[in-house]
């Protein structure tokens, strides 16, 4: 067995020395730790430079930004966890010096870049184009001060907007955006007093506050959808009083009951627990809906209620208003509470009560199950004021034999009649795209076979006309995907529309171009499709040795396009493509997106498991590594299993060997700087066969996939099978527990924010449609908690104390730790204060990396001692 040579070991010794003491010496009292300097420098470096195309396709906005991070002190600010929501009880007004470090505009037609001025010591944030793309609004921030600027592309100059009172000593909350005429810009800002709506007069270069600082930031704030009608805001009611106090003694028992009706629900977090929580929910979520004009007139609309953000009709004459009302639930979050949907006139008069959805505490446990009754109400985008209503015709239960599953109805202004049936679908409704006055695409889908269909209908007909099948494909089969329409913002209708040829005959599609040839992988393409016949023609496709994707079309005839091009040796850059000649002209010269990993070797590898399923992953080798000199490496596999209904789909390889590969700053890839090889996202497909559910054969397939990956690393001569670690997050943590319990392939594991006992998620998890009582053996055999006595390898458990993810309650890790400890296991359990399912605080993220490197250094890095 080959081991690290002395020269390579010396180069990699520093990171290990920084973690010199055993993990047992590090306790919760040690505080937050930081990884080695080499890793810390990576985490502190700016994000990769990015380029964004303006809506008119004339400009590339090129920016270099800080990596957004939150402090643990910010997470520790007063916070409520109610009805599935997490929110601060006081809006954050502090300005953090974090944002865009530098910005420039590159003309797509050619010419020199135009630098957007960012003052020394400041940052730029929230750039937003005007609707005609002639002006770019952005904010510069300094400690305790924020300033709005407007850049004029014609004059290539920027001017500051003077705020009322001399400046904004607060934090930008949101920017509802530009007026249609480009004369005004709306934004909300949070100061010590609260959150308020502001308007900037661009010509006068002044900004003033329109509302008092009482916007209900918890409920949704303000919206200005069409840039011309009054803005609609949710304000805290006047005289709402102080936060309800917790009673000194309980007023009585907490009672829940069920009267014989089957009501399965998946596990949910942050639920209401008692009447005090109910009072808190009402206190923070109750709002007064108001309209606000640009001259500052505020008009109350309706009564105080728990509102969702209203939606304005395309013609600006009506509001679609949703209110949550009692009875609330202790079983589901706000999304399941009773909700009344109404149409209001712009002055607040109730025009029509559309639907009062009852409390939703249950849903059938089966593939294709959905909510009974009307589940979606929205404005039809191509008409002035018409509602689309989607409802299940089978009560949401796919086990019922019915000719049609879903119905889409329409309700037109003035909303006095009854909703009229528009179209019905044999499978679950999957959306509708209105392409032109005579054509729309109607989608339906079934999870029973994972097949999606698209039908061409005539939206001008009351019944949609006779549907014509356009596409019918398996969504698991990446090679069968028809692609996506290319869109461009339409100023007249104020919405994105599919790009069409000048004669309106052709529509344009792009897609990843998946192939069954793993040597070439994905080959993105540009197609044009004749909607009248479904005829498709390929205009262009990425060709090796490059990997290119279409970013934007520059003309409706698709003669030129902007593409993003890269190769294994050329970093990604933007080019103008002549579609006919296939020639490209460089637009940008972006820097290396991860210079700190420039000497890392990356390769997409493919291999098979014994049942013939093809697998793949991205292999990274650490900086300075030389196989012939340094021998085999300790390796870390980071993965996340996925269910499939066919082996063919499971075998497809995503990505391309022609891509420029640099590790991101994801936690597990930072292990490269500590001397480990990393196999990132090795596929772990769980395939259902011969009518069985995928999870009926979960463990054998999981172990076979992991073993195949290790065998491949050994075959390549880079991985030491005796020094393999494995890890994952969420379902990847669940995978890690199973691999340690059901195999002897790994020296150690790292499991973050996982669920380990499936009896605690008895009404389904991931894509598993069956309940525990329908498939008890499957739940039991898949639960690593049930095999805790078999886990002999060291395992590091990490979990946020406020995990908000369905099914991954912190108690999962608590009980797993207790089970492992009780059975003599080698386990370390790290709880991250205040963190949710994903870790946000700078201190938490750095500590997690420290834990991961330390754990692997102790249990994986060193060669096994042979007696």
Regions found by a protein language model. Name each.
Residues 2-14:
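Bacterial N-terminal signal peptides that target proteins for export
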Residues 13-23:
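Bacterial N-terminal signal peptides
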Residues 25-583, 589, 593-599, 651-652, ...:
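Beta-propeller folds
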Residues 99-103, 108-110, 638, 642, ...:
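Active-site-proximal cap/loop segments of hydrolase catalytic domains
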Residues 238, 326, 393-395, 415, ...:
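Short, glycine-/Ser/Thr-/acidic-enriched flexible segments
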Residues 341, 387, 470, 574, ...:
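Conserved hydrophobic/aromatic pocket- or pore-lining residues that grip, position, or stack substrates
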Residues 588-631:
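N-terminal cap/lid segment of alpha/beta-hydrolase-fold proteins
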Residues 627-630, 636-656:
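Short, surface-exposed "cap/lid" segments of acyl-processing enzymes
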